[in-house]
Amino acid sequence: MIDLLVAGGGPAGLATAIHGALAGLEVVVAEPRPTPIDKACGEGLMPGAVRRLGALGVSVSGQPFRGIRYVDGTSGLRAEGLFRCGPGLGSRRTDLQSALAGRAAQLGVQFLPRRVDRVHQSAEHVTAAGLTARYLVAADGLHSPVRRGLGLSAPAAPRRPARYGLRRHFTVAPWSDLVEVHWSARSEAYVTPLAPDRIGVAVLTADQAPFDEQLAHFPHLADRLSGYADTPVRGAGPLRQGARVRVAGRVLFVGDAAGYVDALTGEGLTLAVTAAGELVRCVRAGRPQAYEQAWRELSRSYRALTEALLWARRRPRLAPRIVPLAARLPRVFTGAVNLLV
């Protein structure tokens, strides 16, 4: 019998498949879309993600970056926090996904072009997409059909505006070896170096408007990028997605499907890869229910810092002070940057 049936062939699902294969489990990935899969993503791997991917034998191409720079979108005031434990890596989503899929295939993971929607489980096994396995790992993204089908999606918080992400690539040489986060009154723009001649720009916002209209809120950045757009715009959202639990019988959730706060801290991939390892460890030990607490402990810092930043972002008097405060307290800002690496 299959040990792990993984629903979803994105980074979280593939990291789980690799962890499982390295632990000696029989793993099958059900993913209806062909590789590589492109999605809206900030495309910045924090140092922790780079280290963990290397430990899995995954070699990812990209452009290193040394830290994070906050920039006031109007005045240009900036604050910098450098990583203390090695560089991060700007890598296109398609390159990352291809590298993960290649490593999984090398380890004997089987890929089937199937979509998982309905799930049936008993005390001994779970059945989905015509397959039976000991466990199902739902790594099917932000709007997880498995989570929704099992009635495990938590309702959105009232009076809290939904936020969305928009991403586009530009054929511009990176002007910095840092990921820049530009702050405007209502949105943030993330500039990630991806190659010697390419950067990615991801805008996070509560306003539903076209990418160029969003970018206009950052005049210095918009002027610098004018005429260099190289790819269509990709979008994602609403970003905040609640999950009632991470373990439901023989179904376990990982990555965005396990619940997501916001992309503000850029820590989603690190958490996904780390949680994938904990999930496999718990399953292999015969204690899948222990994964719930493991996930909560792993994600605690990410959730706390992200919620704190969002709380400040939503307050008109506090939001304009985020960058000046970071510039005034460089050691505190650097500590916060390194809290999540």
Give, region by region, the residue ranges found by the protein language model.
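Glycine-rich FAD pyrophosphate-binding loop
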Residues: 5-9, 18-41
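Redox-cofactor binding/interface segments in oxidoreductases and associated redox assembly factors
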Residues: 7, 138-139, 253
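Short phosphate-binding/catalytic loops that engage adenosine nucleotides
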Residues: 25, 58, 109
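A conserved beta-strand/loop capping segment in the N-terminal third of enzymes
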Residues: 49-99
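FAD/FMN-dependent oxidoreductases across multiple families
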Residues: 118, 207-282
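Predominantly flavin-linked oxidoreductase catalytic cores and closely associated redox partners
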Residues: 103-227, 243
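N-terminal Rossmann-fold NAD(P) dinucleotide-binding loop
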Residues: 13-14
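C-terminal helical "tail/cap" subdomain of flavin- and related membrane-associated enzymes
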Residues: 281-341
